[in-house]
Amino acid sequence: MAQRYDELPHYGGMDGVGVPASMYGDPHAPRPIPPVHHLNHGPPLHATQHYGAHAPHPNVMPASMGSAVNDALKRDKDAIYGHPLFPLLALVFEKCELATCTPREPGVAGGDVCSSDSFNEDIAVFAKQVRAEKPLFSSNPELDNLMIQAIQVLRFHLLELEKVHELCDNFCHRYISCLKGKMPIDLVIDERDGSSKSDHEELSGSSTNLADHNPSSWRDHDDATSTHSAGTPGPSSGGHASQSGDNSSEQGDGLDNSVASPGTGDDDDPDKDKKRQKKRGIFPKVATNIMRAWLFQHLTHPYPSEEQKKQLAQDTGLTILQVNNWFINARRRIVQPMIDQSNRAGFLLDPSVSQGAAYSPEGQPMGSFVLDGQQHMGIRPAGLQSMPGDYVSQGGPMGMGMAQPSYTPPQMTPHPTQLRHGPPMHSYLPSHPHHPAMVMHGGPPTHPGMTMSAQSPTMLNSVDPNVGGQVMDIHAQ
């Protein structure tokens, strides 16, 4: 260590290093400029050239004076190197260097060599060793104070480096924990592999809908945004839609808790049972029967409220999320096929379960009637354009057909003027003179071939239901 300091260049003209000021001359006297030999802008300056012109006589330091300065510096360095505390100062300096380049893993040898605890141990060992050999301080108190302050400064550096290391380790630990929590890579890979294989096996059993692959959060949003839909039609009088709903209901027995996957839900081979149950939960028959009963009781609006979901969850022993996912899939797999088949068959909708406008496949209300005084849209929806006028559900004040579930429409007597297919499409336009709203003076429009049971009480009293077929647009002749 002392040899490294000996190699440092020695500079002349240093004040205040314990050497008498008389050796350096007057500190306010002009100093000569040392010769510069590495510049090529002119000849080297003469040693007698000095700063300023106010000094009448140049003050040149003799050679003996320079050697005296070097001797004084050497004595000071020797005093520092020979101080009893210098080995401790060098040790702390090396610890500061090691703190920036040594691995900090607990299992690595020498990882704690630069810690603050090791510094305290080193001080204790050093104090015991030095006291046994020689005292800790020298005869120069100024030098002793300098050594102690230097050791304290390096000690502060070591503590600050240790704080930085702790912050770095804490950040790395929290960052890795956050990544593990947000991205469970192993679980994601296993789930992806299992779902792809299972989907490939189940695709032959049922058709795939794009909406069935949405995460549960998207489906919750779809459930919340579709609550404004109008009522859905029930089973047709011919029983075809009811049979389709029963067959489709088997597809909703087993539903995925996180991602709704296509499939029939029926139990396959026993060797696939464990993998199937791991991928999606198979609900008990009792639970599915309870939820299916609620669904058929509320076909007009198959969207349970939050309180109803909680009650269903308590009755079935499932979670609210499972109940919510079951109804999302049931609306697609049970209700929607019933609507599609009913629209294709064109049967008369049962008023006990259909209380208004049809439920379109796009999830939008199909009703075309509005409140009195509002602008009448007049355009029949796409789902009802292919149906005859006799099959259009009865429209109430809200266009929802507020018929009671126990109500049965009376049989209409045949009439020669009864129109089986209703007026043409252009008569439903608001600007057409044959618009039903103009005939009824802004009230709910009637349709040829429909009874007047869903109209206002005054019309019920003034019109005989048995001659409902004669109530028609007088301009449609």
From Swiss-Prot:
Residues 193-203 have a biased composition (Basic and acidic residues). This is Homeobox protein Meis2. InterPro entries: HD, Homeodomain-like_sf, KN_HD, PKNOX/Meis_N, TALE_homeobox. One of its GO terms (molecular function) is RNA polymerase II cis-regulatory region sequence-specific DNA binding. Residues 193-283 are annotated as: Disordered. PROSITE patterns: HOMEOBOX_2 (PS50071). Involved in transcriptional regulation. Binds to HOX or PBX proteins to form dimers, or to a DNA-bound dimer of PBX and HOX proteins and thought to have a role in stabilization of the homeoprotein-DNA complex. Isoform Meis2B is required for the activity of a PDX1:PBX1b:MEIS2b complex in pancreatic acinar cells involved in the transcriptional activation of the ELA1 enhancer; the complex binds to the enhancer B element and cooperates with the transcription factor 1 complex (PTF1) bound to the enhancer A element; MEIS2 is not involved in complex DNA-binding. It comes from Mus musculus. Residues 340-477 are annotated as: Transcriptional activation domain. GO terms for biological process: eye development; negative regulation of myeloid cell differentiation; pancreas development; positive regulation of cardiac muscle myoblast proliferation; positive regulation of mitotic cell cycle; response to growth factor; response to mechanical stimulus; visual learning. Belongs to the TALE/MEIS homeobox family. PANTHER family: HOMEOBOX PROTEIN TRANSCRIPTION FACTORS. Monomer and homodimer. Heterodimer with HOXB13. Isoform Meis2A interacts with TLX1. Isoform Meis2B interacts with HOXA13 and PBX1 isoform PBX1b. Isoform Meis2D interacts with SP1, SP3 and KLF4. Isoform Meis2D interacts with PBX1 isoform PBX1a; the interaction partially relieves MEIS2 autoinhibition. Isoform Meis2B is part of a PDX1:PBX1b:MEIS2b complex; Meis2B is recruited by PBX1b and can be replaced by isoform Meis2D in a small fraction of complexes. Can form trimeric complexes including HOXB8 and PBX2 or PBX3.
